[in-house]
Amino acid sequence: DNAKAVLTYCFFIILSGSVANLLLDVDKFMLNFYINIDNIAFYSVAIFIATVIAVPSRAMHQITYPITAKLMSENKHDELNELYKKSSITLQVIGGLILVGILVNINELYSVLPEGYSEGIAVVFLIGISKYFDLVLGNNNSIIFNSKYYRAVLFLGLFLVFLTVSLNMIFIPLYGLNGAAIATLISITLYSLSKLLFVVLKMELFPFTKNTIVA
């Protein structure tokens, strides 16, 4: 029974990771059908710049994942809730500083790139906002992955893929590169809200405090 449970868990985690990787390329794949292929390079560079905002969360998750697992196995709800809040406010501050740093220096950054790449400036802003919103949720993923509701991540991820593809079909023909970024912003925001509500309603954990507004 234990072996079956472990294999089932690994299966869902691997599938969830595959969905996440798919999302990294779905925009660029769909742009091929609507705009000049040369412009996709502008989008790729903009995505790369905006993704820098998510770097702190990767380091944070490496630290909080085992701590989260330990607290959940010991049913220490209050300590887990405190960790959730601390991870949220920490990533909010660090991610916010990185986002502001990128946006303040975006024109200088694009001045060293070949002409035409500046078309991706709005993409950097839109994707940056979506990454930042995801950061503010702290160790949300760690909590869901270590709970009995870990299957929910896969289903939410599939919902995100469907939503992203649908929104891309609407916004890319209207706004080109910016349309793909708008679709991603809406999709990630709704996905993040879904995870937030899931953790709040199912596990009674909440990442925000009065310091969230101050920060």
Residue ranges and their predicted role:
Residues R151, L158-L193, L205-F206:
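Membrane-interface helix-loop junctions in multi-pass transport and translocation proteins
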Residues D1, N139-I143, L185-A215:
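C-terminal transmembrane helix end/exit motif
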Residues F12, D27-L31, A41-H61, I89-T90, ...:
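Alpha-helical transmembrane segments of polytopic membrane transporters and translocases
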Residues A46, A50-S88, N141-N146:
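Helix-loop junctions and terminal segments of transmembrane helices
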Residues G128-F159, V199-M203:
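Membrane-interface junctions at transmembrane-helix termini in multi-pass inner-membrane proteins
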Residues L7, S44, T68, K76-N105, ...:
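Interfacial transmembrane-helix starts/ends
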Residues I37, I102-Y132, G138, N178:
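Interfacial segments at transmembrane-helix termini and the short loops linking adjacent helices
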Residues D1-L24, I63, I67-E82, K202-V214:
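Interhelical loop/hinge segments that connect adjacent transmembrane helices in multipass membrane
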